[in-house]
Amino acid sequence: MDVNPTLLFLKVPAQNAISTTFPYTGDPPYSHGTGTGYTMDTVNRTHQYSEKGKWTTNTETGAPQLNPIDGPLPENHEPSGYAQTDCVLEAMAFLEESHPGIFENSCLETMEVVQQTRVDKLTQGRQTYDWTLNRNQPAATALANTIEVFRSNDLTANESGRLIDFLKDVMESMDKEEMEITTHFQRKRRIRDNMTKKMVTQRTIGKKKQRLNKKSYLIRALTLNTMTKDAERGKLKRRAIATPGMQIRGFVYFVETLARSICEKLEQSGLPVGGNEKKAKLANVVRKMMTNSQDTELSFTITGDNTKWNENQNPRMFLAMITYITRNQPDWFRNVLSIAPIMFSNKMARLGKGYMFESKSMKLRTQIPAEMLANIDLKYFNELTKKKIEKIRPLLIDGTASLSPGMMMGMFNMLSTVLGVSILNLGQKRYTKTTYWWDGLQSSDDFALIVNAPNHEGIQAGVDRFYRTCKLVGINMSKKKSYINRTGTFEFTSFFYRYGFVANFSMELPSFGVSGINESADMSIGVTVIKNNMINNDLGPATAQMALQLFIKDYRYTYRCHRGDTQIQTRRSFELKKLWEQTRSKAGLLVSDGGPNLYNIRNLHIPEVCLKWELMDEDYQGRLCNPLNPFVSHKEIESVNNAVVMPAHGPAKSMEYDAVATTHSWIPKRNRSILNTSQRGILEDEQMYQKCCNLFEKFFPSSSYRRPVGISSMVEAMVSRARIDARIDFESGRIKKEEFAEIMKICSTIEELRRQK
């Protein structure tokens, strides 16, 4: 019989079925080709929102810049970026009045962080614009390259390893008349292969020195590279995101540290907490509003949406906020924090790879790099692209577009949240001085607004007042996309509230399944995801049991490890059948060795090896977990590992799972094809870095090499440690006199070599 799916929903409130409408099954859409068009859209839109501002020219780079601050007050509902400085400062003052000492305390906390943070903080994060090579690199490599270039240009403050000293170098580098950098390039040669006698292309990697004058260097230092945001569900159009270079990152980090510290103290802020903690925080605000709207008051909630949040924000506004927040602090601290917004006011957006053209008739393809867009004949482009290029041309310098207004995605999430909360804070009766009042929640560009008033007119007046107040600071509430409901039903950051939060289970769907790390980790992550969803997301016992069975099936197909007694034929079935027949206690075999599944929803918290240990044959135990077995991973065995899981929205989350090192926890080798590319130099650097760190950890087993103490270099630290250890070992009779003398001699040689270098 066919089941009519609508019957499933007869007894379910609509809000609880919300998760069935989310576009989270199947693969998310990825972008192909270049992001140049999306970036030009961003730049053009941002300028359009601020078009009535004042144009100036940057004296150092010659870049034209548009400043909309204190521009005309809006006359219509179009989004605009004309924030009024005095309004922003007043909102900050009222925020401080409602939370006495909040700025002062946050500044003190941040000052401590600024003095303690090491420069390796910048190695966190993924792709980073590497200004020395003019393209994206992993963060650690980009940082290493930057420090290397600084060093060769006589900037050495960063040797001590504090981030603040690295930032001093950045400031000094901007005053230099020229910077010398090393760039990588490829040489291709056609040579005859000795074995096959065919002609082959041989690539060699060369390094060459290049001098950048002050203007070119500044442009690179202020550049944000752009890419297309991938895997965005529920959208028809792609959009551009930015990755800043190393010069900007450190300054942004300190500003965000300050803003994060403020957000933690604001009850309306949805950042920096997440998950259940965030839900609890939100529920508190809703409870407060509903309790206060006694029988005499109405309470309504707006599920809010802001138009182009980032593109209407302005770094100059953030500078004003920081100036106010840090007003009683020492000058050095105020200066460090004001550099990020100043750099953003002068930022340049790199247009990406450019356009690809192909001629169908001549079977030709050619790449038009972004640098050429400034003076290429526009007849080759379609109308839409022509318009974009014409509009952006006055802003172009060296393939980058001057972009003074706007913020680019995800740069100052915390600080912009502080701005949003400061407007929510103005909804208290003592500020509105009338019968309506409001409160709400803010998390970056997402907000929920709760308005209370004695009657409908009051609610309308409250919403209007909020809307207009937002306009004054460059926040544009979208009247089309925001909707209002009786309080008790709303959505905020994809949490759906209906007299309490309903589980939006579909959001977690992408993290179910086999991760593809290795057999051991995948099994552990798979069951942990199911366990976590039973705890946090209303995954019921029956559904969880089904999810588990589907997972095991998926796992067996992925690793071709069907049960030893199955009829399914795969590449591995011959070996697994043999193992099955030799094994006395078949229940002890791991699923990945063709064993049965012993998991059910009661024992998901136990790693599979532990679950089956007592059931295993002795020789199987010996093979599986023997440290002398060359296939057992020899990484340090930690009881807890971290996996990256992809929830449906928001960044990839880190999830802990139990790790037991066995023959199944192998680590796949790096793809060899990288060795023939220009990335090879980078790979060698990375391996070198790895070797140094491993060596360092041998000398300081209890430490993590991330926290060097004092200002001695790693080598000096290791030499002095070696001398101390050797003396102790010699005096306690663990080593002979000759060995002790040899160690001392090696130490002296190392020091001598360092001096000569």
From Swiss-Prot:
GO biological process assignments: DNA-templated transcription; symbiont-mediated suppression of host gene expression; symbiont-mediated suppression of host mRNA transcription via inhibition of RNA polymerase II activity; viral RNA genome replication; viral transcription
Domain of life (superkingdom): Viruses
Region (Disordered): 50-81
Domain RdRp catalytic: 286-483
Region (Promoter-binding site): 249-256
Keyword annotations of the record: Eukaryotic host gene expression shutoff by virus, Eukaryotic host transcription shutoff by virus, Host cytoplasm, Host gene expression shutoff by virus, Host nucleus, Host-virus interaction, Inhibition of host RNA polymerase II by virus, Nucleotide-binding, Nucleotidyltransferase, Phosphoprotein, RNA-directed RNA polymerase, Transferase, Viral RNA replication, Viral transcription
Entry keyword Translocase: no
InterPro entries the record matches: RNA-dir_pol_NSvirus, RNA_pol_PB1_influenza
Record PTM: Phosphorylated by host PRKCA.
PROSITE patterns xrefs: RDRP_SSRNA_NEG_SEG
Localisation: Host nucleus; Host cytoplasm
GO cellular component: host cell cytoplasm; host cell nucleus
EC number: 2.7.7.48
One GO MF term attached to the UniProt entry: RNA binding
Residue ranges annotated as motif Nuclear localization signal: 187-195, 203-216
Keyword Phosphoprotein annotated: yes
Reactions catalysed according to its record: RNA(n) + a ribonucleoside 5'-triphosphate = RNA(n+1) + diphosphate
Residue ranges with Polar residues bias: 55-64
Subunit structure: Influenza RNA polymerase is composed of three subunits: PB1, PB2 and PA. Interacts (via N-terminus) with PA (via C-terminus). Interacts (via C-terminus) with PB2 (via N-terminus); this interaction is essential for transcription initiation.
Function of the protein: RNA-dependent RNA polymerase which is responsible for replication and transcription of virus RNA segments. The transcription of viral mRNAs occurs by a unique mechanism called cap-snatching. 5' methylated caps of cellular mRNAs are cleaved after 10-13 nucleotides by PA. In turn, these short capped RNAs are used as primers by PB1 for transcription of viral mRNAs. During virus replication, PB1 initiates RNA synthesis and copy vRNA into complementary RNA (cRNA) which in turn serves as a template for the production of more vRNAs.
Recorded family membership: Belongs to the influenza viruses polymerase PB1 family.
The protein's name: RNA-directed RNA polymerase catalytic subunit
Species of provenance: Influenza A virus (strain A/Silky Chicken/Hong Kong/YU100/2002 H5N1 genotype X3)
